[in-house]
Swiss-Prot record:
NCBIfam families: PRK02101.1-4. HAMAP family: UPF0246 (MF_00652). One of its GO terms (cellular component) is cytosol. This is UPF0246 protein SAG2081. Belongs to the UPF0246 family.
């Protein structure tokens, strides 16, 4: 079976309020840490102004008191990649694929199924803090590496920020997808192309219940198709011809 790893996003869209689920021990440690920080501390950590820091301080207090809203993670994040993922009006098979094959990598929750209920938060792996005397990447490394202990095919739609949480040994198991536009023979890529294409690709995988790499290579989405010459066993490249 294929498992697809996607990152969180800075943009979020809060949509509902549901009873709180049980939190992992690691998540509780991070919440406890942030709930002790002052507004001034948060200004320095987030590099934001006092007004924004006050809002973050209140959010962490509400987090600790379990007074924040909860949303399915795949619907909470609203960055460019997420806006290009089909997230509403899913068929039964699409919902099953989303539940069983799509996982979100988080600096607060670890690796979670895409439909897990979570709260809005401001935290990524570039945040300069120490938890138990470790960076967030080191703090989560064992948890992330444990996720890789299966025979499933691990497809990465992650940025370097998230991939480097894994130890080098486990990182080697990831299958990367690259998205390139061919403009009159000139191959080009940039973050906007990649983020949109990741969302479109994930949608195509879900709609077609893609469970093997061979099936993935056959998919067509938003003008992209697999290019064997630009690919290898660990890097699958999809090219979109622009006229």
């Amino acid at each position: 079976m294929i498992k697809i790893l996607i990152p969180t996003a800075k943009e979020m869209k809060v949509c509902q309020n549901i009873a709180w689920p049980k939190l992992s021990a690691q998540t509780k440690i991070i919440i406890d840490y942030f709930s002790t920080l002052t507004v001034s501390d948060l200004e320095d950590i987030y590099r934001i102004n006092t007004s924004a820091a006050r809002c973050e301080a209140q959010r962490w207090q509400d987090f600790k008191a379990k007074q924040l809203t909860l949303n399915p993670a795949i619907k909470l994040f609203n960055g460019l990649m997420y806006r290009n993922i089909k997230r509403h009006n899913l068929s039964t098979s699409e919902a099953q694929f989303m539940e069983n094959s799509v996982f979100i990598t988080s600096a607060l929750y670890g690796i979670i199924p895409a439909m897990t209920l979570i709260s809005p938060h401001r935290l990524d792996f570039n945040t300069k803090i120490k938890i138990n005397n470790n960076s967030l990447k080191v703090f989560w490394r064992e948890n992330y590496d444990t996720f890789m202990q299966s025979d499933d095919i691990m497809v990465s739609l992650l940025s370097n920020e998230f991939e480097t949480v894994f130890s080098p040994k486990e990182r080697q198991k990831l299958i990367h997808l690259n998205f390139i536009e061919d403009r009159d023979g000139q191959l080009k890529t940039h973050s906007t192309i990649s983020k949109k294409a990741r969302g479109k690709c994930l949608t195509a995988m879900m709609e077609n219940n893609c469970q093997t790499l061979e099936h993935l290579k056959q998919l067509r989405f938003d003008g992209f198709c697999y290019d064997n010459e630009l690919s290898d066993s660990k890097q699958l490249t999809f090219v979109k011809k622009q006229t």
